[in-house]
Amino acid sequence: MISKEQFDKEIELIIANAIREDVGDGDHSSLACIPDSAKGKAKLLVKDEGIIAGIEFAKQVFAYVDENMKVDTLIEDGSKVKYGDIAFYVEGASQSILKAERLVLNAMQRMSAIATKTKVFVDLLEGTDTQILDTRKTTPGIRALEKWAVKIGGGTNHRFALYDMIMLKDNHIDFSGGVAKAINKTKAYLKETNRDLKIIVEARNLQEIQEILDCGGVYRILIDNFNYEDTRKAVALIGDKCLTESSGGINEKTVRHYADCGVDYISSGALTHSVYNMDLSLKAV
């Protein structure tokens, strides 16, 4: 996984690029009708229900736009919210509040939706030892925000990107000439380049799982698109030789059944690619 320093840098880049994209050479709507000296106050109003996420990110946005803005937080990230709740108040230059408004809302609406969906999966897994993982099926440019939201919702982050963990999937295996060749080439590459990266290998059937185990040195086996019966067989075959992960179209109706098969992790792209934004507003008070 990436370090905190790397993650913080990603957040800084997201904010800078989003403000560049949205503000350009100036918020001319505000500049045209609001004096530089005008002060204002606004509230973040919840118009939905679920798990709130992105409050700490909003603070960073306000600070980036204008370090003199003050935020009074009433509700923390990860809290359950309902219609009518006020998450925070922000106070400062009216122009600055308006400049930050859309980025704050866009981010918080999506992050809250992801956190809410993640919490549904987490609750469905309660009582098992299985953790829910996100994937790289994220919105380009804001992956750090979406993975942050998964953690706020109680989920666990998978690898951040292609560079912080090795995952040998079906195409890697086929292009390499088979499971054993892919794994052995990977081990040689890591040794040659002096890299310490964990290896995950996708298995499409029980025979490939045995091939992976025979090679050894794998951190986790991805049991992809298996039915329940074969998943249980795979878990029994793997035992404590490495960790296990189920994936492949797993949803709210099936996630508990896969957890009951004994896997350590379940990954779901739906946490980030299939959500409906939470309805939030930033209103002047």
What feature does the model see in each segment?
Residues 203, 248-253:
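Small/polar glycine-rich anion-binding or flexible loop at a beta-alpha turn
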Residues 2-204, 208-215, 220, 229-237, ...:
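Acidic/glycine-rich phosphate/pyrophosphate-binding loops and surrounding catalytic core
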Residues 223-224, 244-250, 268-270:
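Glycine-rich beta-strand-to-loop/alpha-helix junction loops that act as flexible
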Residues 281-285:
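Active-site loop ensemble at the mouth of alpha/beta enzyme cores that anchors a bound cofactor
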